[in-house]
Amino acid sequence: MALPRSQGHWSNKDILRLLECMENNRPSDDNSTFSSTQSHMDWGKVAFKNFSGEMCRLKWLEISCNLRKFGTLKELVLEAKKCVKKMNKSQKYRNGPDFPKRPLTAYNRFFKESWPQYSQMYPGMRSQELTKILSKKYRELPEQMKQKYIQDFRKEKQEFEEKLARFREEHPDLVQKAKKSSVSKRTQNKVQKKFQKNIEEVRSLPKTDRFFKKVKFHGEPQKPPMNGYHKFHQDSWSSKEMQHLSVRERMVEIGRRWQRIPQSQKDHFKSQAEELQKQYKVKLDLWLKTLSPENYAAYKESTYAKGKNMAMTGGPDPRLKQADPQSSSAKGLQEGFGEGQGLQAAGTDSSQTIWVNCHVSMEPEENRKKDREKEESSNSSDCSSGEEIEVDV
């Protein structure tokens, strides 16, 4: 239930005070789960200033919705305090003096300009349906008009980057604080451990096997999108209106557009993906029947090793031929990883870069769960890093 602004407006300072009061007044036997402990909390003692005990309780319930659902009350209160302090540092950086405003993409410019006109034309239409109409109108724009939006975006983007560089020079203290608060120590330690583990695993492999991460067999059917979001992502990625964006900006924009389209359109993409999956299974079964027993065993071995960052043992097969590592898809991946999503081992050259996959997917959580369930039954091998090799059968 939303509180009135006069009673329910909480500043970050007020939230920190609430968490401190909770920490000081929590039950002494705080050994149970946080939900059990908070039910025995005396919220009258937590009350402060103009915030009653009931208001404090409701605010804590709102805060705890964004926290993990296990642990003691003390642990969750400490976690919430860290989040608020981190938010304060980030806001100081973003709201600092003269911080430049990020420019709108070409599509968002058209969307912002056209929204008032179309909302008057269709006063009773829902926002989702109106967004769908505007998306269609943008796709139907003449190339000359579309280029105007793209050029305006590029011009403002260049100005933004210049202003941002000046801002960082003039306010190095704010930049340094924002960098320190962007990644928690826990995350840093987790990434470092995973990085060291990957180094040890790769170094333990024979040199000939180290960087053959994906094996693709000649004639093997291409794996289709696993769900509706993947199909939408695939269709949007190569569209003309996305070509002027960088890899990172393109991923963000596709994620935003997915959130805007109506459920009926999402269901349509889902149906397309399911149909492609059925066709893929039929093609895969037919292709597997054409393999010799030796090649079939090699294929099963390679798919079994998928996802474990392991190469096929016994050195390179003379039947294997190396695919071009500088393909357009490989370049796109390298560009995406190059923006802070990979780590390179000290003392190795660029051909022996060991990537630690720590990026956040733009894909909704429910789709990622479905992907993990389908991954067990999938016989296709995804490229995580390194080179691709192809088998002639």
UniProtKB/Swiss-Prot annotation:
- Enumerate the Gene Ontology biological process terms: blastocyst growth; embryo implantation; positive regulation of transcription by RNA polymerase I; transcription by RNA polymerase I
Q: Which SUPFAM superfamilies match?
A: HMG-box
Superkingdom of this entry's organism?
Eukaryota
Q: Short name of one Pfam family for this protein?
A: HMG_box
GO CC terms:
cytoplasm; nucleus
Q: Tell me yes or no: is Nucleotidyltransferase among this UniProt entry's keywords.
A: no
Q: Name one GO molecular function term.
A: RNA polymerase I core promoter sequence-specific DNA binding
Give the lineage: Eukaryota, Metazoa, Chordata, Craniata, Vertebrata
Signal peptide bounds: none
Residues within the DNA-binding region(s) = 100-168, 222-288
Q: What is this protein's function?
A: Essential for proliferation of the inner cell mass and trophectodermal cells in peri-implantation development.
Main location (coarse class): cytoplasm
Recorded hits in InterPro entries, A to Z, give: HMG_box_dom, HMG_box_dom_sf, UBF1
The name this protein carries in UniProt is Upstream-binding factor 1-like protein 1
Cellular localization per UniProt: Cytoplasm; Nucleus
Q: Which gene encodes it?
A: UBTFL1
Residue spans of biased composition, Basic and acidic residues class = 365-377
Q: Which UniProt keywords apply?
A: Cytoplasm, Developmental protein, DNA-binding, Nucleus, Repeat
Originating organism: Homo sapiens (Human)
**Residue ranges of region Disordered?**
308-393
